[in-house]
């Protein structure tokens, strides 16, 4: 087994920088205006609203990842970009991806793209699980790092809401960093999340049952459910609840956990959803050891505490870290929390695209002001 190191991240950004055209490189038809500091660009991949390249940082002599985001034509992309920048420029934790630098033009009117510079990670858990089975040691270490990062996120009063294998970045020394905070929210049990299900369909498999049954009342336990799904996937190399649609997803969950008890049904505040569940024929639960016959017994014990139908009975992140399965890594003195909880309003659903653009511009400006080195 490889030696596990903790990668110290050098955060030495220059902030928002005006980028002249002469400092541009073209990667697969996309212009990257990130010179002269960032050179030798190489394609990594692309998502819905941006391309990612690796580059040499001439200031730190490190290889970094640069994400080019062109969000301003779409409301949703603007919202996600703003959330990501707002959160990640304030978070500082070994198991959460950092923002080292942000580049954009100096004029808001001319701002078409934003370049976000981050720590370079070689792969992600989704890709890793496609290619190899993990040893129990690797599963244990990855799970510990996920929960260590999540403890920090939850201590900041933030829900990630989109934890899944492709949002867990890995490097060669098995360091893990949580990324993609585009769907994150302040933890507010009264917030109505009705638009969430339509906002991002691809992550249905990792959604807690209460998300599909209630429009509000979400707590930090929705992220714990997602971590449970990820642990199950690490144990078997396949998703535990691969629902094809909303009802199929629910049936997959009930097919494993069994029918919810009368007590558990009480946590469903949507009467229609509760009546539907009560109308279903009784289903027994499937023992975890039958589903995962080769898994460590302690891993399955923790899995059962995370994949609990009732969110009020689901294990909180602090207790999960203290579980005997993670005993070899557990160190409360080295599991930092956020210095202050988030008080910034991230509910930007009703803000116009132009206003979102202004807020993104302002956030990049604030980031520059917080940097120790403000030299251009």
From Swiss-Prot:
Organ and tissue specificity: In third instar larvae, expressed in eye imaginal disks. In adults, expressed in head and body.
MF GO annotations: ATP binding; DNA-binding transcription factor binding; MAP kinase activity; protein kinase binding; protein serine kinase activity; protein serine/threonine kinase activity
Signal sequence segment: none
Keywords: ATP-binding, Cell cycle, Cytoplasm, Kinase, Nucleotide-binding, Nucleus, Phosphoprotein, Serine/threonine-protein kinase, Transferase
CC cofactor: Mg(2+)
Record PTM: Dually phosphorylated on Thr-198 and Tyr-200, which activates the enzyme. Phosphorylated on tyrosine residue(s) in response to insulin.
Entries under PROSITE patterns matching the protein: MAPK, PROTEIN_KINASE_ATP, PROTEIN_KINASE_DOM, PROTEIN_KINASE_ST
Gene Ontology CC entries for this record: cytoplasm; cytosol; neuromuscular junction; nucleus
Notes on how activity is controlled: Activated by tyrosine and threonine phosphorylation.
Motif residue range(s): TXY: 198-200
Protein name stated in the entry: Mitogen-activated protein kinase ERK-A
Function recorded in the entry: Serine/threonine kinase which acts as an essential component of the MAP kinase signal transduction pathway to regulate proliferation, differentiation and effect cell fate decisions in various tissues. Required downstream of phl/Raf in the sev/sevenless, tor/torso, and EGF receptor homolog Egfr signal transduction pathways. Required for embryonic epithelial tissue repair. During larval development, mediates Ptth/tor signaling leading to the production of ecdysone, a hormone required for the initiation of metamorphosis.
InterPro entries the record matches: Kinase-like_dom_sf, MAP_kinase, MAP_kinase_CS, MAPK_ERK1/2, Prot_kinase_dom, Protein_kinase_ATP_BS, Ser/Thr_kinase_AS
Matching SUPFAM superfamilies: Protein kinase-like (PK-like)
Residues the record lists as Phosphotyrosine modifications: 200
Residue ranges annotated for the Protein kinase domain, each copy included: 38-326
Gene that encodes the chain: rl
Positions that bind ATP: 44-52, 67
Protein EC: 2.7.11.24
Record-listed Phosphothreonine modification sites: 198
Disruption outcome: Embryonic wound healing defects. RNAi-mediated knockdown in the prothoracic gland (PG) delays the onset of pupariation by prolonging the L3 larval stage and increases adult weight.
Catalytic site: 162 (proton acceptor)
Main location: cytoplasm
């Amino acid at each position: 087994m490889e030696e596990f190191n903790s990668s110290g991240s050098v955060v030495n950004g220059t902030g928002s920088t005006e980028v002249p055209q002469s400092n541009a490189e073209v990667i697969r038809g996309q212009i990257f205006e990130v010179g002269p500091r960032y050179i030798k660009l190489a394609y990594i991949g692309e998502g819905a609203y941006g391309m990612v390249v690796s580059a040499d940082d001439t200031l730190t002599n490190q290889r970094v990842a640069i994400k080019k985001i062109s969000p301003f034509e779409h409301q949703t992309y603007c919202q996600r970009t703003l959330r990501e920048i707002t959160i990640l420029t304030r978070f500082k934790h070994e198991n959460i991806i950092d923002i080292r630098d942000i580049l954009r033009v100096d004029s808001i009117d001319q701002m078409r793209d934003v370049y976000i510079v981050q720590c370079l990670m070689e792969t992600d858990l989704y890709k890793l699980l496609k290619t190899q089975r993990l040893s129990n040691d690797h599963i244990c270490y990855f799970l510990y790092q996920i929960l260590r990062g999540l403890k920090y996120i939850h201590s900041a009063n933030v829900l990630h809401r989109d934890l899944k294998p492709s949002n867990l970045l890995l490097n060669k020394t098995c360091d893990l960093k949580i990324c993609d905070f585009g769907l994150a929210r302040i933890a507010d049990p009264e917030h109505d999340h009705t638009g969430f299900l339509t906002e991002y369909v691809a992550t249905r498999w990792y959604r807690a049952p209460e998300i599909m049954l209630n429009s509000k009342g979400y707590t930090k336990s929705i992220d714990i459910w997602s971590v449970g799904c990820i642990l199950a996937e690490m144990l078997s190399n396949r998703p535990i609840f691969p629902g094809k649609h909303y009802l199929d997803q629910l049936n997959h969950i009930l097919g494993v956990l069994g029918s919810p008890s009368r007590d558990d049904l009480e946590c469903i505040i949507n009467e229609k959803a509760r009546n539907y569940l009560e109308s279903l024929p009784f289903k027994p639960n499937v023992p975890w050891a039958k589903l995962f016959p080769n898994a460590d017994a302690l891993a399955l014990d923790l899995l059962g505490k995370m994949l609990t139908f009732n969110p009020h009975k689901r294990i909180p992140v602090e207790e999960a870290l203290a579980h005997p399965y993670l005993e070899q890594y557990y160190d409360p003195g080295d599991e930092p929390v956020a210095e202050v909880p988030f008080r910034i309003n991230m509910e930007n659903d009703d803000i116009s695209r132009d206003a979102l653009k202004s807020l993104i511009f302002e956030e990049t400006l604030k980031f520059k002001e917080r940097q120790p080195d403000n030299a251009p």
